[in-house]
């Protein structure tokens, strides 16, 4: 795509900054759940929290939190999506050899799983070659798939979902490209919107950025995003959620504010705390209807060895 050509230098520069910040030795942060733990904050999902979340369903309304995936949608280079629909052996008329005049479509999907609405697993990002629970990348990451920290190990993520409307707190429909979201911003929004975050909750931030720009200005949408600062990721981790997400493709601000490390929110959440990241979530309706708590349900495709997965969680209230 022309987008990739246009933004390749910017993205390369950001990656160089990130790599330069991670070449030094990193301290091992062991899991709260033991040396053999591979699912991190998903350990916080339990029957009591699931039952409590189910009680949030008052109107019987369900809403898809995954946006539509369009093969033409820009993605972080070199990621892409290609879909082919075929009719093997029959092409609408040829005899399928099944004893009746059947016709069918099949599909072939070629894509990077870190595209569109997605779940970042604990094997996605580390620092200096080290990942969640002191796992060394060279020991579990192979071209054929991860042997630890993979998507297929994650149990269904079910619990209380919480929406924090950052755009409303800022008095705008959409935050601007690269606009930082600090812990003070999050705390102020929580106070104004009477939002509390409990252990095991799934926290979603609404910036309005995807609703405003994905279709109207895809190059802007893919080139930079508003997002949390490094210290805001530490604050969010201190709330002990199961997952943190936003309606942007990266969660942290890109480019980062001065003094921050690009994408380092991923290290804080994934590597240091085992907290999952949800990207490009469809939060617009929740914000428009002031739905700040809901039941969240996610059962991702269990592709063995996968790092990430395209997802469509459901919010119910």
Where are the model-predicted features located?
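Bacterial N-terminal signal peptides
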Residues: 11-21
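Short non-domain terminal segments
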Residues: 1-2, 16, 90
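Bacterial N-terminal signal peptides that target proteins for export
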Residues: 1-12
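Active-/binding-site microenvironments in catalytic and ligand-binding cores
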Residues: 26-317
């Amino acid at each position: 795509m022309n987008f990739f050509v246009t933004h390749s230098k910017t993205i390369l520069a950001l990656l160089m900054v990130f790599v330069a910040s991670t070449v030094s030795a990193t301290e091992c942060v062991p899991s709260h759940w033991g040396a053999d733990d591979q699912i991190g904050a998903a350990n916080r999902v339990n029957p009591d929290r699931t039952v409590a979340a189910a009680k949030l369903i008052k109107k019987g309304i369900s809403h898809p939190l995954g946006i539509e995936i369009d093969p033409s949608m820009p993605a972080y280079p070199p990621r892409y999506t290609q879909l082919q629909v075929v009719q093997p052996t029959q092409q609408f008329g040829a005899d399928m050899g099944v004893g009746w005049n059947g016709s069918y479509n099949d599909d072939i999907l070629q894509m990077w799983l870190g595209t569109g609405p997605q779940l970042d697993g604990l094997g996605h990002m580390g620092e200096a070659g080290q990942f969640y629970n002191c796992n060394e990348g060279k020991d579990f990451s192979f071209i054929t798939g991860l042997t630890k920290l993979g998507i297929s190990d994650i149990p269904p993520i079910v619990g209380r979902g919480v929406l924090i409307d950052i755009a409303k707190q800022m008095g705008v429909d959409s935050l601007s490209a690269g606009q930082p979201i600090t812990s003070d911003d999050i705390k102020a929004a929580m106070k104004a919107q009477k939002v509390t975050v409990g252990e095991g909750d799934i926290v979603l931030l609404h910036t309005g950025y995807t609703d405003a720009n994905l279709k109207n200005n895809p190059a802007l949408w893919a080139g930079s995003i508003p997002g949390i600062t490094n210290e805001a990721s530490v604050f969010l981790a201190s709330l002990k959620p199961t997952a943190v997400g936003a309606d942007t493709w990266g969660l942290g601000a890109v480019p980062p504010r001065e003094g921050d490390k690009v994408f380092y929110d991923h290290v804080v959440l994934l590597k240091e705390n085992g907290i999952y990241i949800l990207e490009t979530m469809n939060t617009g309706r929740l914000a428009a209807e002031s739905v700040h708590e809901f039941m969240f349900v996610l059962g991702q495709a269990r592709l063995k060895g996968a790092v990430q997965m395209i997802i469509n969680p459901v919010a119910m209230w």
